[in-house]
């Protein structure tokens, strides 16, 4: 009866590293541009120039 419940051992797979094997500073690929987030007041001012109604709707939606 104990032979019915005998299970095979699971095969252990090798654990892969969590980070890819890259050299730091190789400089071969594209890099993220260094830009800061725009100021919201500047954004509203530019939106008013382009479309005043869109600026009003954005102001209501964002709570400003």
Swiss-Prot record:
Residues 1-12, 33-64 have a biased composition (Basic and acidic residues). Belongs to the ubiquitin-like protein UBact family. May function as a protein modifier covalently attached to lysine residues of substrate proteins. This may serve to target the modified proteins for degradation by proteasomes. The keyword Hydrolase does not apply. It comes from the Bacteria. GO terms for molecular function: protein tag activity. Residues 1-64 are annotated as: Disordered. Keywords: Isopeptide bond, Ubl conjugation pathway. There is a cross-link at residue 64 (Isoglutamyl lysine isopeptide (Glu-Lys) (interchain with K-? in acceptor proteins)). It holds the Pfam family UBact. Coiled coil: none annotated. This is Prokaryotic ubiquitin-like protein UBact. It comes from Chthonomonas calidirosea (strain DSM 23976 / ICMP 18418 / T49). InterPro entries: UBact (IPR037543).
């Amino acid at each position: 009866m104990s032979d019915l419940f005998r299970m095979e051992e699971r095969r252990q797979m090798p654990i892969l590293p969590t980070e890819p094997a890259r050299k730091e500073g190789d400089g071969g690929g594209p890099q993220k541009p260094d830009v800061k987030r725009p100021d919201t007041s500047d954004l509203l001012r530019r939106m008013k120039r382009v479309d005043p109604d869109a600026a009003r709707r954005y102001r209501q939606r964002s709570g400003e």
